[in-house]
Amino acid sequence: MTEPAAWDEGKPRIITLTMNPALDITTSVDVVRPTEKMRCGAPRYDPGGGGINVARIVHVLGGCSTALFPAGGSTGSLLMALLGDAGVPFRVIPIAASTRESFTVNESRTAKQYRFVLPGPSLTVAEQEQCLDELRGAAASAAFVVASGSLPPGVAADYYQRVADICRRSSTPLILDTSGGGLQHISSGVFLLKASVRELRECVGSELLTEPEQLAAAHELIDRGRAEVVVVSLGSQGALLATRHASHRFSSIPMTAVSGVGAGDAMVAAITVGLSRGWSLIKSVRLGNAAGAAMLLTPGTAACNRDDVERFFELAAEPTEVGQDQYVWHPIVNPEASP
């Protein structure tokens, strides 16, 4: 394991878990055309994967984070070097296979963005268990654990439930941002779940075409004990916050996006930083909304600027409370959508 920088004992520590990290490569081309050889611009390399992105933004915002992740091969070595250069503390579980790459191609002529995501390496059972062992030790002294991103090929879909069980035994709040089977197999133990509408739709098995349906689905997860709090990111339309007793709508922050990468991770990071400061959920989600907007100003997967986050935070309107009578839930039962 590697940890190039010590954490500040005076600050609440945030542990992030990234089971499928990536070396993010961003480049540009005039026009994307099939079959032709396209001459691209100089590449930009960034350390990536959900939890790693969260740790980078926590660091930018002045929080104290340690990124925990498996890594291997030359891509894993470069990813670690980039994190070290950024001053983000990390702990690595060495694996035999090589860390994956992901590619973002910006088409200059149209301002369109193309994102290509590789599946990632398979982890042995021993490597998977070592990740949990490292988390178990780290969670005991953490203020929050953030598990974010996809699971690698071959890892059981209930892996994040095992993460939740570890956090529950450590009395450490878990913030989860994932999709697919990793999300669908969560049954309990999550403090805050961040989901897009698509991810929420997959989780409950309904189309969720309207805001009342989206809020009702979020409350369904809370009522079933799968999470205590649900934040639904709505992209350009803002966000929703659901707790056991209330719901709030957060408006989007007007701005012109440069990139569509990383806004969700920035939102999760800023929410966690806010909570680690002792802020209310509402204030923390306002900060998350601001960080998500600030992330859209950066090229590729570069971290957002703290000044932009603070500026957008000041611009962000207070949320609107949504009455319970506006989101009565009539679920469409999908036996494959929930455990």
From Swiss-Prot:
Its EC number is 2.7.1.11, 2.7.1.144. Induction: A member of the dormancy regulon. Induced in response to reduced oxygen tension (hypoxia), low levels of nitric oxide (NO) and carbon monoxide (CO). It is hoped that this regulon will give insight into the latent, or dormant phase of infection. Not inhibited by an excess of substrates and common allosteric inhibitors. Inhibited by high concentrations of the reaction products, fructose 1,6-bisphosphate and ADP. It is an enzyme of class 2 (transferase). The active site is at residue 265. Pathway: Carbohydrate degradation; glycolysis; D-glyceraldehyde 3-phosphate and glycerone phosphate from D-glucose: step 3/4. Keywords: Acetylation, ATP-binding, Glycolysis, Isopeptide bond, Kinase, Magnesium, Metal-binding, Nucleotide-binding, Potassium, Transferase, Ubl conjugation. Has strong T-cell and IFN-gamma inducing capacity in human tuberculin skin test positive patients, indicating this might be a good vaccine candidate. GO terms for cellular component: cytosol. InterPro entries: Carboh/pur_kinase_PfkB_CS, PfkB_dom, Ribokinase-like, Tagatose/fructose_Pkinase. It comes from the Bacteria. One of its GO terms (molecular function) is ATP binding. K(+) binds at residues 259, 261, 295, 298, 300, 302. Activity of PfkB is tenfold lower than that of PfkA. Activity with tagatose-6-phosphate suggests that PfkA and/or PfkB may substitute for tagatose-6-phosphate kinase and further support glycolysis. This is ATP-dependent 6-phosphofructokinase isozyme 2.
